[in-house]
């Protein structure tokens, strides 16, 4: 009985000793992991305090964004800002990204849960190759746990690159809400003040004769300008903040018309406005040719010019519509 008791005591002692020996490396590894994580967070916080958007090369990206351990998310903008790249959209997107990062850095809700970083192609081309990335700018959220999923890549062509739109996307992916605070822009109030001053000056100069306020042609022209601006998608641009155009970084080809029906470029708005204006001018000429008291020769010229404008610009408008709504069966002169 005593021998059996000694056997059990020795067995229990050996098991406990074995567990302690095995736990020592595990605890040591855990402490080392926590130290590495603490160093990474401290480094990121130090850089963020100096500059809200951290510039990264390949080494920094692999060490601080890709390599574990990590308990923070990193929003990375992949871009090409060097002048010889001639990426106008990259500069515009960078300005919005800086506004967003500054809004987060100087907000009362600022924590180390999320950081903003930037990788320029000329400083980290190996990162672009590692991620098989062939366009810029691109925004990707690298979450605290796991690899980026499909939704962690920002849909720039659909949402645009305004700071407010990127902030909504970040809130969806990280549950971190950022209130965008833009620096004051005095251009709008100045233009409004100038417009009011001009109108006030005209009213003052013509105070003895106010018939110009009831001029049908003036009001019709103002209404037409407003309609052309609204039907061309100007309000959509104001809300979404899309890029002016898109330049392929590899071929250098510039696209002014977006290939999807869910988005558009600012240049596309100007083109559509021009085409609508051309059709409108053609219709006005046709109406004048039919109702004017001018001689028959001038009326014929106006009629031919009006038909030409309507046919040409409507055909161009329809071709743009076909390029955006794939499968649309109808065309006119141009496919």
From Swiss-Prot:
Q: Hey, what tissues is this thing expressed in? A: Ubiquitous. Expressed at very low levels in brain, lung and kidney.
Q: What induces it?
A: Up-regulated by low extracellular Mg(2+).
InterPro entries listed in its UniProt record: OligosaccharylTrfase_OST3/OST6 (IPR021149), Thioredoxin-like_sf (IPR036249)
Subcellular location, record wording? Cell membrane; Endoplasmic reticulum; Endoplasmic reticulum membrane
Annotated glycan sites: 71
Domain of life of the source? Eukaryota
Q: What is the effect of changing residue 87 to S?
A: Reduces N-glycosylation of cysteine-proximal acceptor sites
Q: What does this protein do?
A: Accessory component of the STT3B-containing form of the N-oligosaccharyl transferase (OST) complex which catalyzes the transfer of a high mannose oligosaccharide from a lipid-linked oligosaccharide donor to an asparagine residue within an Asn-X-Ser/Thr consensus motif in nascent polypeptide chains. Involved in N-glycosylation of STT3B-dependent substrates. Specifically required for the glycosylation of a subset of acceptor sites that are near cysteine residues; in this function seems to act redundantly with TUSC3.
Specify the protein name. Answer: Dolichyl-diphosphooligosaccharide--protein glycosyltransferase subunit MAGT1
Species whose genome carries this gene: Homo sapiens
